[in-house]
Amino acid sequence: MSCLACAQPSTTPFCESCAKLEYLELIRTSCHHSTSTNPVEMAQALMAHPRFPAAGQAHHPLVAGLLVAAYRNAGGDANIAEMDAAIQRANTIPGGFCAGFGADAAAIACGIAVSVIEGATVKAEHAVARSLAHTLTGQGLLLIANNHGNRCCKRSVFTVLELAAHFFTATMGVALTPPSGRVECAFSAENKLCNGADCKFYPAVPPVKAGPRLAVLG
């Protein structure tokens, strides 16, 4: 078995060192070492880390970083510095953004990934790059807007990464790996505001709560 973050041999999903990482360094470490082209699968692994919050700001850099990493792993032209830039930029979006600012940050994080990959600026020569970023963000926002009930960061992450896998394949010149079947959330028992069977990612067999997790609201 290899550590899901640093990819070094480990007897547990996360090695002793990586199990102690806070979310930002966890995301960086995993993005630097991952070879996966499946961003949903990557997100499921990292959100299962014992120190990854149940909700909140951590989900924003998760989305941006994993998309740049998956793009790079699929043969796209992206480097470690760009990966780190996407992570850092998305981490500036505060928790609770979805409720207070009129846009879900998971969707914005998708646009951040595209902007970093394309090197978008405000100049005319980057109009196409901005359009690509805005299109993915907009599509993500529309999907999230059609969700009902309590806000859920996991639901937003699954929604936009599933979308982005298809978007990147269609428009970004690389083939990301989409989920092979229906995505099932393994975190419903950790969320006191879980929408249960009303959520399209609610598992057929709901998981039993394994233990306490950081509950950062956002």
Language model feature labels by segment:
Residues 29-65, 150, 185:
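Polybasic, low-complexity association/targeting segments
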Residues 118, 122-169:
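A structural-propensity feature for long, helix-poor, extended segments
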Residues 155-185, 199:
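C-terminal domain-closing interface element
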Residues 61-74, 80-82, 86-134:
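Conserved mixed alpha/beta catalytic, RNA-binding, or beta-rich assembly cores of soluble enzyme
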Residues 184, 204-210:
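Long, Pro/Ser/Thr-rich low-complexity/intrinsically disordered regulatory tracts in eukaryotic proteins
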Residues 2-8, 16-17:
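Short, cysteine/histidine-rich loop/knuckle motifs that typically chelate Zn2+
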Residues 45-57, 92-102, 143-149:
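A short glycine/serine-rich beta->alpha loop
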Residues 208-218:
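Long, compositionally biased intrinsically disordered regions
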